[in-house]
């Protein structure tokens, strides 16, 4: 059987739910069936070491790396690109009223013009994060099928809808992580509602069990229930529900420790 060529495009592999989900997906793929390339806008992150060895991490996109990397040494190597990054970022923020919109503007008016296309052609190409990864997928990748991913409730992202609609129309499917997120996308883009599909963030039980055996943190209490909540401290993550649950446990006289 001829192996299919697949590309994943991602911002980085720093700590985050989308990053963890991507690594889990890569660990579940059958590499006897797929040749997999991974393109990172920033070739870094705590999950890099967990990427399967069968995955080819593309490492020759110097223009892309310089535009998205804050490394001063890299900036000195490529002063022209560094200048575009600084000027483009400054003008984009002046032209818009949010970080999200400024990054959309920066891609459309600055980065899109100088980031080169990938030369390799793919059977399937996947932008595993919304915004610039999706724009790169549409503008710079040749693939028979293109899939975009939205890992948040779209209405909370603060994007220019008109720009995203233009790009969503050019992909085959837009995957999101919950029925609520899909409903929100369909309400924002009713003309392409059939493109939105749901695939919850993937977890690997094998990886979780392996990591659990590595060590016990000093905060771990063997004689009580340990509850760990991980995430950004903002309204979207809903940490107030964890506090409500902790109160109920206390009322029920359950011995526990809560860690945030």
What residue spans do the PLM features occupy?
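Active-site proximal beta-strand in glycosyltransferases
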Residues: 6, 124-129, 135-154
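N-terminal strand-loop element at the rim of the active site
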Residues: 8-15, 32-99, 196
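A conserved mid-protein helix/loop that constitutes part of the nucleotide-sugar donor-binding site
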Residues: 19-24, 225, 229-248
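Glycosyltransferase donor-sugar binding loop
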Residues: 39-45, 230, 255-260
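Short N-terminal targeting/anchoring amphipathic segment
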Residues: 96-104, 113-130, 147
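Nucleotide-sugar donor phosphate/pyrophosphate-binding loop at the beta->alpha transition
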Residues: 105-112, 134, 151-170
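A short, active-site helix/loop in glycosyltransferases that binds the activated sugar's phosphate group
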Residues: 134-136, 172-197, 203-205
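Acidic anion/phosphate-binding donor-loop and adjacent secondary structure
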Residues: 155-162, 186, 202-224
């Amino acid at each position: 059987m001829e192996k299919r060529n697949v590309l994943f495009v991602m911002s980085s592999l720093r700590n985050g739910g989308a990053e963890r989900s991507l690594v889990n997906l890569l660990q579940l793929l059958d590499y006897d069936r797929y040749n997999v390339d991974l393109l990172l806008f920033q070739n870094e992150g705590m999950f890099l070491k967990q990427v399967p060895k069968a995955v080819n991490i593309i490492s020759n996109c110097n223009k892309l790396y310089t535009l998205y990397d804050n490394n001063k040494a890299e900036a000195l190597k490529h002063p022209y690109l560094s200048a575009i990054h600084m000027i483009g970022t400054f003008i984009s923020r002046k032209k818009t009223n949010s970080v999200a919109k400024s990054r959309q503007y920066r891609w459309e008016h600055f980065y899109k013009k100088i980031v080169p296309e990938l030369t390799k052609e793919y059977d399937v190409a996947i932008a595993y994060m919304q915004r610039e990864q999706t724009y790169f997928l549409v503008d710079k990748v040749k693939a028979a099928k293109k899939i975009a991913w939205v890992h948040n409730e779209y209405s909370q992202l603060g994007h220019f809808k008109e720009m995203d609609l233009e790009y969503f129309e050019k992909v085959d499917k837009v995957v999101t992580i919950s029925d609520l997120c899909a409903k929100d996308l369909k309400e924002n883009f009713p003309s392409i509602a059939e493109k939105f599909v749901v695939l919850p963030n993937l977890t690997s039980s094998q990886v979780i069990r392996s990591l659990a055996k590595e060590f016990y943190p000093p905060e771990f209490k063997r004689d009580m229930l340990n509850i760990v909540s991980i995430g950004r401290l903002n309204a979207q993550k809903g940490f107030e529900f964890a506090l409500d649950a902790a109160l109920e446990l206390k009322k029920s006289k359950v011995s526990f420790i809560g860690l945030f």
